[in-house]
């Protein structure tokens, strides 16, 4: 196995890195490999680390054999993600032997070194300086300012036409099933000017879609205690002026989210909200330590759709949470029927080391969790299929992601990369390139995907 894995554990509704960086290498140039696991926030951390290393004269290798050392950026959100991270570390040790570990699982160094005592160093999430120090110790830098050129946007692990834009780090919530605040700390928002400057550089470099991410996007700037109550609102408006698609992810359902909807109706940002509702029964939400207001949530959804009829709503849910009864699960199914969400992800609850939910009574049996997951996804799939069938005959603006000999893979404004569906063009695609925007008439629909033909407008 010579090539380094770049696929994250398939555990969360997140976006996976799809490209491996392969930078030209001059003679004698130190070279680093990177394995990036987990969510988009971790991917941005990987990009920042690689950018710093490129600036110091390191080349980036796409395989183990060409690397002087390998960085593994780990995921530690769920126990199954931890196991997959340990597997990736083990593979890097076997294939290369010189491994530096960082990321969320790095917050548990004893857990890592207990399994892999030969790793060179372990650092926690977004500890960039410690990672660089570890790299310097393993492979000293050898910069050449006349040869080592760095793109204005830094090193990116996404296709050229879309990019993640991380606006904050950490989270102030205390959900019982989650340990992210323990791993990444409390909310720290990036200055608005820094976010906008990064976004401007990305758009100038050809990025057509900005995917705004954080642990809690709608809480952006609330840690400043400044005169603006909800800084996400002016930030979203400013981003919407740049001429790229702007897609909001990880939006916690605060009441002020309704103030984002007019920006969507105006066309400044995409009419798309990624909101993790997690459940609908008030008692389950209370056990999760999340807002127990499912009825009000339905009212909010109705208001969003009234003010922006084209809005697409994506959410994620947990089934089999400790203590979940059949009645509580049925409430979730009934809520989904009424909410008619466009895009849905669902996960079976599992214990996470350090999570307070582990101590809750009445854990649900694995076979019952699986059965409930299947019932939930069957309903969600039927809703998706009906909603997509209603798109047949409509003309939609799409962005091209990939083009090969068989056709073009595109996305509508209602679809985020990797986690949502695609729109496929099978004819008349030869002149298209990734990043192109065009109008397509929908001709066929499936459970999650669409097919159509390009039209001239």
UniProtKB/Swiss-Prot annotation:
Q: Which InterPro entries match?
A: Elp3/MiaA/NifB-like_rSAM (IPR006638), Methylthiotransferase (IPR005839), Methylthiotransferase_N (IPR013848), Methylthiotransferase_N_sf (IPR038135), NA-bd_OB-fold (IPR012340), Ribosomal_uS12_MeSTrfase_RimO (IPR005840), rSAM (IPR007197), rSAM_horseshoe (IPR023404)
Which principal EC class is assigned to this enzyme?
transferase
Question: Could you tell me where this protein is found in the cell?
Answer: Cytoplasm
**Disulfide-bonded cysteines:** none
Give the E.C. number(s): 2.8.4.4
Task: List residues of the Radical SAM core domain.
Answer: 157-386
Q: Does the record's keyword annotation contain Phosphoprotein?
A: no
Query: Which positions fall inside the MTTase N-terminal domain?
Result: 30-140
The catalysed reaction is: L-aspartate(89)-[ribosomal protein uS12]-hydrogen + (sulfur carrier)-SH + AH2 + 2 S-adenosyl-L-methionine = 3-methylsulfanyl-L-aspartate(89)-[ribosomal protein uS12]-hydrogen + (sulfur carrier)-H + 5'-deoxyadenosine + L-methionine + A + S-adenosyl-L-homocysteine + 2 H(+)
Q: Where does [4Fe-4S] cluster 2 bind?
A: 171, 175, 178
Q: Which GO terms describe its biological process?
A: tRNA modification
One GO term in the molecular function aspect is: protein methylthiotransferase activity
For this protein, the record's Pfam families field holds: Radical_SAM, TRAM_2, UPF0004
Q: Please provide the record's keywords in A-Z order.
A: 4Fe-4S, Cytoplasm, Iron, Iron-sulfur, Metal-binding, S-adenosyl-L-methionine, Transferase
Start and end residues of each TRAM domain: 389-456
The cellular component terms of Gene Ontology attached to this UniProt record, alphabetical and capped at eight, are: cytosol
Q: What does the note accompanying the cofactor annotation read?
A: Binds 2 [4Fe-4S] clusters. One cluster is coordinated with 3 cysteines and an exchangeable S-adenosyl-L-methionine.
Residues annotated as binding [4Fe-4S] cluster 1 are: 39, 75, 104
State the protein's purpose. Catalyzes the methylthiolation of an aspartic acid residue of ribosomal protein uS12.
PANTHER family this protein is in? RIBOSOMAL PROTEIN S12 METHYLTHIOTRANSFERASE RIMO (PTHR43837), RIBOSOMAL PROTEIN US12 METHYLTHIOTRANSFERASE RIMO (PTHR43837:SF1)
- Family assignment? Belongs to the methylthiotransferase family. RimO subfamily.
Q: What is this protein called?
A: Ribosomal protein uS12 methylthiotransferase RimO
Q: Which organism is it from?
A: Cereibacter sphaeroides (strain ATCC 17025 / ATH 2.4.3) (Rhodobacter sphaeroides)
Gene transcribed to yield this protein: rimO
């Amino acid at each position: 196995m010579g090539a380094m894995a770049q696929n994250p554990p398939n555990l969360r509704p997140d976006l996976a890195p799809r490209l491996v960086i392969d930078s030209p290498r001059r003679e004698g140039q130190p070279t680093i490999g990177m394995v990036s696991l987990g969510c988009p926030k971790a991917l941005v951390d990987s990009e920042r680390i690689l950018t710093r290393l490129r600036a110091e004269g390191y080349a980036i290798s796409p395989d183990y054999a060409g690397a002087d050392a390998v960085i593994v950026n780990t995921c530690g959100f769920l126990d199954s993600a931890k196991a997959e991270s340990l597997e990736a570390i083990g593979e890097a040790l076997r294939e290369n032997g010189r491994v530096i570990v960082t990321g969320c699982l790095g917050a548990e160094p004893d857990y890592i070194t207990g399994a892999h005592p030969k790793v060179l160093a372990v650092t926690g999430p977004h500890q960039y300086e410690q990672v660089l120090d570890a790299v310097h110790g393993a492979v000293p830098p050898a910069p050449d300012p006349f040869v080592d050129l760095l793109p204005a946007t830094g090193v990116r692990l996404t296709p050229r036409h879309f990019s993640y834009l991380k606006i904050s780090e950490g989270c102030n919530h205390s959900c019982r099933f989650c340990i992210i605040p323990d791993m990444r700390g409390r909310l720290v928002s990036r200055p608005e000017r820094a976010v906008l400057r990064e976004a401007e550089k990305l758009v100038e470099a050809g990025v057509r879609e900005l995917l705004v991410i954080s642990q809690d996007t709608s809480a952006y700037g609330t840690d400043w205690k400044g005169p603006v109550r909800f800084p996400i609102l002016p930030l979203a408006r400013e981003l919407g002026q740049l001429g790229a698609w702007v897609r909001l992810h990880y939006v916690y359902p605060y009441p002020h989210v309704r103030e984002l909807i007019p920006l969507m109706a105006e066309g400044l940002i995409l009419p798309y909200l990624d909101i993790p509702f997690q459940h609908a029964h008030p008692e389950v939400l209370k056990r999760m330590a999340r807002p127990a207001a499912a009825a009000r949530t339905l009212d909010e959804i109705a208001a969003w759709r009234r003010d922006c009829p084209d809005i697409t709503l994506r959410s994620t849910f947990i089934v089999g949470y400790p203590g979940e009864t059949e009645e509580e699960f049925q409430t979730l199914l009934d809520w989904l029927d009424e909410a008619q969400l466009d895009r849905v992800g669902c996960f079976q609850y599992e214990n996470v080391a350090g999570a307070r939910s582990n101590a809750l009574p009445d854990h649900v049996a694995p076979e019952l969790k699986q059965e409930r997951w299947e019932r939930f996804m069957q309903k969600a799939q039927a809703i998706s299929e009906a909603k997509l069938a209603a798109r047949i005959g409509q003309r939609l603006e799409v962005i091209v992601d990939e083009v090969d000999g068989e056709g073009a893979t595109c996305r509508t404004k209602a679809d985020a990369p990797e986690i949502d569906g695609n729109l496929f063009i099978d004819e008349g695609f030869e002149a298209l390139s990734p990043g192109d925007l065009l109008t397509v008439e929908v001709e066929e629909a499936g459970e999650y995907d669409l097919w159509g033909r390009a039209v001239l407008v």
